[in-house]
Amino acid sequence: MSMTASSSTPRPTPKYDDALILNLSSAAKIERIVDKVKSLSRERFAPEDFSFQWFRSISRVERTTDNNPSAATTAAATATVHSSVSSSAAAAASSEAGGTRVPCVDRWPFFPFRALLVTGTAGAGKTSSIQVLAANLDCVITGTTVIAAQNLSAILNRTRSAQVKTIYRVFGFVSKHVPLADSAVSHETLERYRVCEPHEETTIQRLQINDLLAYWPVIADIVDKCLNMWERKAASASAAAAAAACEDLSELCESNIIVIDECGLMLRYMLQVVVFFYYFYNALGDTRLYRERRVPCIICVGSPTQTEALESRYDHYTQNKSVRKGVDVLSALIQNEVLINYCDIADNWVMFIHNKRCTDLDFGDLLKYMEFGIPLKEEHVAYVDRFVRPPSSIRNPSYAAEMTRLFLSHVEVQAYFKRLHEQIRLSERHRLFDLPVYCVVNNRAYQELCELADPLGDSPQPVELWFRQNLARIINYSQFVDHNLSSEITKEALRPAADVVATNNPSVQAHGGGGSVIGSTGGNDETAFFQDDDTTTAPDSRETLLTLRITYIKGSSVGVNSKVRACVIGYQGTVERFVDILQKDTFIERTPCEQAAYAYSLVSGLLFSAMYYFYVSPYTTEEMLRELARVELPDVSSLCAAAAATAAAPAWSGGENPINNHVDADSSQGGQSVPVSQRMEHGQEETHDIPCLSNHHDDSDAITDAELMDHTSLYADPFFLKYVKPPSLALLSFEETVHMYTTFRDIFLKRYQLMQRLTGGRFATLPLVTYNRRNVVFKANCQISSQTGSFVGMLSHVSPAQTYTLEGYTSDNVLSLPSDRHRIHPEVVQRGLSRLVLRDALGFLFVLDVNVSRFVESAQGKSLHVCTTVDYGLTSRTAMTIAKSQGLSLEKVAVDFGDHPKNLKMSHIYVAMSRVTDPEHLMMNVNPLRLPYEKNTAITPYICRALKDKRTTLIF
């Protein structure tokens, strides 16, 4: 068909949504996946395949010591590469120098497994198959990336206590394993113990052993941790109790059906690692799955042509990190003959064809050709010309500011942010603010790291230079380097934490501590997989504080890199949107069941604070006030009794009246209305005041309008005369909380309908800002401050799968966020820890918890806790790399491929273009299809062959 047909002939308005029709048409075949998975998961391994103690024998490794270096040298000289698994590999295991652990591969059994391949175009419905599997089967759902895992959590509507995890966290990977996996020395050493060369991997047994060797430093560390814990449990209790404790270590003990999303980002050997740990944990815990001899069934979901799996190596001596393209799991299952035959891929491949994220037919046809590597037609190339815009426009931050910019490299993203910040400083300086990022370095651990990395070095490298060179590794999320960071790093010495605590009052309240609206547990904070950490640290040694500053833009589009703890404290949006949320119970419905009471309490607090707006809106007249006073106010026993007691009390103490309607006091100059942005730019403050919570005092002798209003019952809101501020949830039963919520909601909706009728519908379009039981002040530096010095709300989490708007920051105490003081140096706590405030798509405001992370470095077989960083865990959605955008759906996209892009690949083009949900909102600086690019030709023949194979399950 013609690629321009849609532009020449207008299409009739469909009766049903296109996405709905496409999903319904594929539903029947998606259900067949369940039957296929059931069949694969019934496989059993033979009882003689494993002895009960197999995990003990394979974990025993030989280590050399400094006392006998000749033995290591002799063993290394005799180590040879064999074409089969033999006892000589075990002898070679004792040859390891430098403390790197190597396995005794002659004792390894073969770990059988089954695999199902699920691939398809971007937005074609692969996630739908995961939803169906989760609904119909008992399976372990995971993702390769944090974004993929959190996206699945949202789609599957998982509760806060059952969030989807990454596959790495499921099998026990923690931050200390990052340097173990990247160590160049370890990988060079382990290469000597491969049972054969890659081209000689003619059997699945050889392939499995070589793949496990590639990841052995991490495997060995996790295995040792588990075995040590098992032995301690067995020594203090019974073997059965130890096995039961081990069974709770990993979700891999829950089911033999393991679903992994975005497998195109996972290296080939990780498939065998997952299989290994499935057997390890189940054998260690003697689980039902192990006793029934269940073979693991791995469901690999993703696209082999969208992105690449990257392999990284880090050299401590040169401090260089090399990154190269590796073979991902999906490509291996499609191309590797050994895996194809063993997994019977021809019969176990499900392929989704059409794009449902963007239902434009011409655009979908183009993406289909790009996904499968089919040679493009001339009309495809010509079709992309329509998206080209001048490069100067895309690189100009003021042009189409609402569009997300995508670039090939981090350098280009940094350059764009610098241009953006410079432009904002000239026109909207009040939108810029910067916050400190702290790094507390343990001097003793850093000194030891330098000695291990360079034993012959005269003096250690300056710590601030090391910090700058390793910033992307220390701040463990890739997009951190894209932010506009200060070039200057301040360095200062810190006293030992114990001395600081002894000097100051030890009972000082921790920042962020205190009472909690949601309870004392503080939510489901993800902790390390193993609590007993053998990393070397020196808590009482001297420490160095490194500080740099990071610049943010108020109103910019942002995301988070991982599930971050947050507190919902308010709402900011239009009155109409807030009413829609109330009528549909949107916030209540999206809240997990165990938090229902807290959700009702929070929305009740927002409604209480928002009631003032009916009396102070720009459209309010005396006639409207009379009508508002007639709205029925039902009795709420928990609120009215306290109000009656207050009314019976003497006159207002200190001249404070709960009916003060002091709102936006600095909002005018000379009787003229001044825009909020202009007031903020002139250093003034915007106040959102709740009458009965106001602490405003005016010492002037002049009689103000507010004082005159106090004597006029017309301007006294009967709502605040009848009801007091809602108490905390701990003082109310669930029934009382729900009754309070429904009463406030009904009053608000009645008032809204009245105002709509009297204003001709204009009231709905007004902006509404309301905070939970608090008055707030917006300061000129983007700081949001509570007049009580604290915020209270509902503990929740923000997800990397969602996009948020940055509203500013607060330095006030957040009562609902548990304290992190025990993880942060007390001198850093004393300086005050600011928290960012985000707004989600519905308009709810979140206070984001600070991100505290420990950086553990491994060198010469020793793990060192070198430093702890305190930052904000934020990534920008205003601009990002194309690789980072993988898995996201973006409304408006502007892609900059550069002037003369090098190493441009079809995967880059495909991922960048397929992020958009509507091609009308896509622009690019060039037509990348007219430039030289690397084609995905290697995998195309396999995909084309599968499309023609009747055994392949095709879902359109």
UniProtKB/Swiss-Prot annotation:
Q: Name one GO molecular function term.
A: hydrolase activity
Q: Name one GO cellular component term.
A: host cell nucleus
Q: Extract the CDD domains matched here.
A: SF1_C_RecD
Q: Where does ATP bind?
A: G120, T121, A122, G123, A124, G125, K126, T127
- UniProt record, GO biological process: DNA replication
Give the compositionally biased regions (Basic and acidic residues): 679-694
Q: Which domain of life is it from?
A: Viruses
Ranges of Low complexity compositional bias? 667-678
Q: What is its EC number?
A: 3.6.4.-
Q: Which UniProt keywords apply?
A: ATP-binding, DNA replication, Helicase, Host nucleus, Hydrolase, Nucleotide-binding
Q: InterPro entries of this UniProt entry?
A: DNA_helicase_dom, HSV_HELI, P-loop_NTPase
Q: Which family does it belong to?
A: Belongs to the herpesviridae helicase family.
What is its quaternary makeup? Answer: Associates with the primase and the primase-associated factor to form the helicase-primase complex.
HAMAP family this protein is in?
A: HSV_HELI
Q: What is this protein called?
A: DNA replication helicase
This chain's source organism reads Human cytomegalovirus (strain Merlin) (HHV-5)
Q: Which gene encodes it?
A: HELI
